[in-house]
């Protein structure tokens, strides 16, 4: 009977765990929909800023913003690592961290030092354990990221690049493909290449005739900074949508596994109960025969 009592306790424990994972699955599904809406809402802004910056850059070819100039003499590269603040999201962080380590090795083989900016607690903890130099960080963004919280940490890298101290700036994050698929990617933020200013069909954007106030250089300077900030925000929004999708899938898998474990334990319990009843009946029959 002690064995049956222990099995009942295990069944109850797994049932309670399944209730938790099921609730977390439902919460993640709700947050995923909101995160996807924010991700989609951010894209038109970045696209429009890119288009305007492209038009103005072509209209003023004599001016080259520092973001568009390669710092060939710099021996340090910057990486902005975007991860989650929380766990329980499958291999989401593992994949982007693995890709980041590979990028570190590639840059170091080229004689480049690497300085990082961490967005998310998981990435910050990893970089500290990895021994990387962390120049800035931002954690605990919550479910609704605001650009104001990101600007300070990101601006550190942008300023260093403008001063010619960084050879390039990369951003590592998890791109949202669909609910079941997310991809760890590393993209070059700076220097801005001509690909950044191409239309969606791959053709160069056409030039417009602008009247500038106060002047073209000041407007281009502001636009390019806003554009890079928009790219970072888009990466964070994509990462958050990926996080909630991965968490929903992970919690669903956990709930399904818990259901399987409960069924197996229930079968063991029934067999034990059947064996106990059979034993009792045998004892009763044996006792009656003895009388």
Swiss-Prot record:
Highest taxon, organism lineage: Bacteria
Pfam families: ATP-synt (PF00231)
One of the protein's GO biological processes: proton motive force-driven plasma membrane ATP synthesis
Protein topology in the membrane: Peripheral membrane protein
InterPro entries in alphabetical order: ATP_synth_F1_ATPase_gsu, ATP_synth_F1_gsu, ATP_synth_F1_gsu_CS
Cellular localisation: Cell inner membrane
Keywords: ATP synthesis, Cell inner membrane, Cell membrane, CF(1), Hydrogen ion transport, Ion transport, Membrane, Transport
HAMAP family assigned: ATP_synth_gamma_bact
Family: Belongs to the ATPase gamma chain family.
Name of the protein this chain belongs to: ATP synthase gamma chain
Source species of the chain: Burkholderia ambifaria (strain MC40-6)
Lineage: Bacteria, Pseudomonadati, Pseudomonadota, Betaproteobacteria, Burkholderiales
Gene name tied to this protein: atpG
């Amino acid at each position: 009977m002690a064995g049956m009592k222990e099995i009942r306790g295990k069944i109850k424990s797994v049932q309670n765990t399944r209730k938790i994972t099921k609730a977390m699955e439902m919460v993640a599904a709700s947050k995923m929909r909101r995160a996807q809406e924010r991700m989609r809402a951010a894209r038109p802004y970045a696209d429009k800023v890119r288009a305007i910056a492209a038009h103005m850059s072509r209209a003023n070819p004599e001016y080259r913003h520092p973001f568009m100039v390669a710092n060939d003499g710099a021996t340090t590269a910057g990486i902005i690592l975007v991860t989650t603040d929380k766990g329980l999201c499958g291999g989401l962080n593992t994949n982007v961290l693995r890709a980041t380590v590979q990028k570190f090795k590639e840059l170091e083989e080229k004689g480049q030092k690497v300085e990082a900016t961490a967005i998310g607690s998981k990435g910050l903890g990893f970089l500290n354990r990895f021994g990387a130099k962390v120049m800035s960080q931002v954690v605990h963004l919550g479910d609704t990221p605001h650009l104001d919280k990101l600007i300070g940490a990101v601006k550190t890298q942008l300023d260093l690049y403008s001063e010619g101290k960084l050879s390039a700036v990369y951003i590592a994050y998890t791109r949202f493909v669909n609910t079941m698929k997310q991809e760890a990617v590393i993209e070059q933020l700076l220097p801005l290449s001509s690909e950044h200013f191409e239309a969606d069909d791959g053709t160069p954007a056409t030039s417009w005739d602008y009247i500038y106030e106060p002047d073209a250089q000041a407007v281009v300077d502001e636009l390019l900074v806003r554009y890079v900030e928009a790219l970072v925000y888009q990466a964070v929004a994509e990462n958050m949508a990926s996080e909630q999708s991965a968490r929903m899938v992970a919690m669903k898998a956990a709930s399904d596994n818990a259901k399987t474990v409960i069924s197996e334990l229930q079968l063991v319990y029934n067999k034990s109960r059947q064996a106990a009843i059979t034993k009792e009946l045998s004892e009763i029959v044996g006792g009656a025969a003895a009388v």
